[in-house]
Amino acid sequence: MTIPLEIQQRCQQLKTELQRASYAYYVLDDPFIPDSVYDQLYRELEDIEKRYPQLITPDSPTQRVGDKISSQFVSVRHNIPLYSLENAFNLEELNKWGNRWQRYVNETQDTEYVCELKIDGSALALTYENGFLVRGVTRGDGVTGEDITPNVRTIRSIPLRLNIDNPPAIVEVRGEAFLPLDTFDKINQEREEKRESLFANPRNAAAGTLRQLDPKIVDKRRLQFFAYTLHLDDNNITNQWQSLDRLESMGFLVNPHRQLCPSLQQVAQYYQDWQEKRHQLAYMTDGVVVKINDLQRQNRLGFTQKFPRWAIALKYPAEEVPTVVKDIIINVGRTGAVTPMAVMEPVQVAGTTVQRATLHNSDRVAELDIRVGDTVIIRKAGEIIPEVVRILPELRPNHTSPFQMPTNCPECQSPLVRPVGEAVTRCVNSSCPAILRGSVVHWASRDALDIRGLGEKVVILLIEQGLVTAISDLYSLEKTEIAKLDRMGEKSALNLITAMAQSKNQSWSRVLYGLGIRYVGSVNAKILAESFRTVEELANASVTDLASIYGIGEEIAQSVYDWFRIEANRDLVAKLQAAGLQFAAAAKTTTTKATLAGKTFVITGTLPTLKREEAKELIEKAGGKVTGSVSKKTDYLVLGEAAGSKLEKALELGITQLTEAQLLELIKA
């Protein structure tokens, strides 16, 4: 069907005007048309697109909110790792960082810095192809994140199409999605009216919103987005300040309170000013991000295993507020650690309602001499974990008694043990309900087996009914058994059975993390799973074998070794293997396309995610050749952290340098 020219022109006119109005409203905060006019124009565009679907384009304002996502979010690898930042908690630590970077590049002069407010939200990585938004991904572990593109498209301060002539093939943008405080309050008010659980703080609400399976819900919550990093091949951009200006010109909302500081002395003043003024903002911040402005100097400084050397997050001091202790209870964790907790009158700390705070251990309880009825000062350590800082003895009521740590586990009544040299008291009964409960919840957690629907309440019901006495029991549960549990039913039971079946496809590193071995976090689990391709290899490794792996120290090595010496743990592994869980690394896929045929590579330094042997294997499978030294025959030098003389030689010979991300793109080409 031929579309009349005047209809085509009107459609484009409406799109342009609505995009301009949206930018003025959500980015510039300076609307030029009333909402009623916007709605009228929007409906007109909708009507045209319904009659002529050929006119629908990905950047149309009508295409921001899509249909429900059919299944779980897909994990994708970041093209460029999304590093977290090193933290400094005072000006002394800021100055130490300044001295460190100067020593690293052998400089004695200070430099120019860009200061930006550290927004308390969720980091996102956006990819634009030929100017159009094609992907929005969560930070995840920095290497891989979840593809939440349908939800990202609903955020009005993220342009669907870049405001740029002749856009590059690829543009990467990083920034923070967040909820303004008034929006957060409104959401919690609505949830309270519906008798739904309240969000603890705006950061949690933003993260939870982004993982919604229905973009319409995300759209209603009106998330905002501040852009702060631009990855774009443009020789005209030489510093971070220019990057931020370019992001603004492309149509992004960039925090207006950024400042260019000629020295760390001015950085300190900026930090102190905003520490005082931060509560005047319409959103939460938890510090200041300091970046070296010069991009060439950033490149020279590079990255550590975790952080960029050219940036640091200067956190605000924790807020401290008084409250009254109503009770002191004992919490038993999944590792058996017994932690005293203060139950208090509810109080707001750093934007969150706090009713409990950790007392850490028996030594800390004795040091504080904390008692029920005491008025205490609490704060959030790193603005995350509430803790009791001190008591106010002058406000202590009469006839209080010192708190006594129990000698038996409050959950199973087994004698508690305090290992020599440790501050933590432990329950060592592997059948303790609290340890089992914590272990199963950990097994089902997002970074482990990610079993949707298996939260703490369901776990408690399964344990109380005697259906689960070990993690392995999860995989022999019947739908009818689950359906009989309180508030479950047939549909929920089927969903849970399906989620547990899907968990059998999770990787060996996730399974290893899910086992809950002391000191083995998700990152350590990945390192171990890469070094030991099967559980048998890991179980048979000596402490020396384990400790020799980069990133695995003596403490972790001893813990892993000891865990596999316990018969009950070996039995658990055997049962989980029999249930079909993955206890071996997946076979590495081969590349059939010889995309690197005839090319010679040299690898130098430590790569962000690949071991050198893994990078070599990928190159060779793609038809390339890897040599140990740079010569005129070298086509590419693959650069990692701490590149040495090979880089100097490559620069001298004019050899092309590649990052790990660029190498992977070359292989895929």
Curated annotation (Swiss-Prot):
This protein's UniProt keywords: DNA damage, DNA repair, DNA replication, Ligase, Magnesium, Manganese, Metal-binding, NAD, Zinc
Catalytic activity of the protein: NAD(+) + (deoxyribonucleotide)n-3'-hydroxyl + 5'-phospho-(deoxyribonucleotide)m = (deoxyribonucleotide)n+m + AMP + beta-nicotinamide D-nucleotide
Cofactor(s) this protein requires: Mg(2+); Mn(2+)
InterPro entries: BRCT_dom, BRCT_dom_sf, DisA/LigA_HHH, DNA_ligase, DNA_ligase_AS, DNAligase_adenylation, DNAligase_N, Hlx-hairpin-Hlx_DNA-bd_motif
Residues reported to bind Zn(2+): C409, C412, C427, C432
E.C. code: 6.5.1.2
Residue positions of the active site: K118
Keyword NAD appears in the UniProt entry: yes
Reported function: DNA ligase that catalyzes the formation of phosphodiester linkages between 5'-phosphoryl and 3'-hydroxyl groups in double-stranded DNA using NAD as a coenzyme and as the energy source for the reaction. It is essential for DNA replication and repair of damaged DNA.
Protein name: DNA ligase
Gene: ligA
